[in-house]
Amino acid sequence: MNDILLKSVAILSKHSEKEDGMMPEGSAPMPHVDSVERVVTLVRNIIFSDYFNKRQPEEQIRAYYIGVNMEELYKLLNAQIARGLLFCSCMSEAEAADKARCLALDFIEQLPEVKRLLYTDVEAMFMGDPAATNYGEVIYSYPSIIAMTHYRIAHVLQLMKVPVIPRIITEQAHALTGIDIHPGAQIGEYFSIDHGTGVVIGETTIIGNHVALYQGVTLGAKSFKYDAEGNMLNVPRHPIIEDNVTVYSNASILGRITIGHDSVIGGNIWLTHDVPPHSRILQSKAVDASFSGGLGI
């Protein structure tokens, strides 16, 4: 048995040619997935402070708990951004450290807006779900709020051009909730996803305000464009969903099309063309084609 173990260790310790081709050059430290997950937890503790810290009515004590989380957040995010920069570029460690400090502070400066947006998402989810008994239930347990917390954090980092980390964050939410939102997607305020499992929102999707999706909705690409050398081009290829649109379960909206404001897209619809405002796109009514009493068979 020991010989088998030693043999496997020896083989696995050697880098394969394919493995070498996937590794970054040099020996730069790589982002730490558990630390990135902790970043999200700290942001959640700050934004939903009364729910995830000891609830304190006095502002001074509340500020203390937020401050403790904020200090840890800055240090951790600073370190992980630096690792991400080193992982994806030819920066020196000193250059990466300087840039990471600036980016971490920039992110923290944007936290009030992240908080504002997330509270609109909580309100939209609560108001749109008669099964929700209170706001706390939504914040603590709803998959859409878990996914949107991850997405709102990741989107800010994506706009700041932080490499790797935004995608790690949204894929952590994907694993937790079954909701797949690319950090590059643009999503307005008062956004809700009921149930959530199986929802996919692609990188270049644009979603307006007061939009509601149900489980299984895909906002995806219909086809891909290629350059002269056969490489896929990263161009807008996902839908634009305007304000006050509801998309019901398992609808697939594909390509760079626009769903006009105040529209309803029914369940199990396959849509690849523009829809004007105030539209209702529904399936044809089911037709009963059975034979009465078995006659005619």
List each model region and its residues.
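Structural signal for interior beta-strand "rungs" in well-ordered beta-sheet cores
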Residues: 173-289
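Terminal amphipathic alpha-helical/low-complexity segments used for targeting or macromolecular assembly
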Residues: 1-168, 295-297
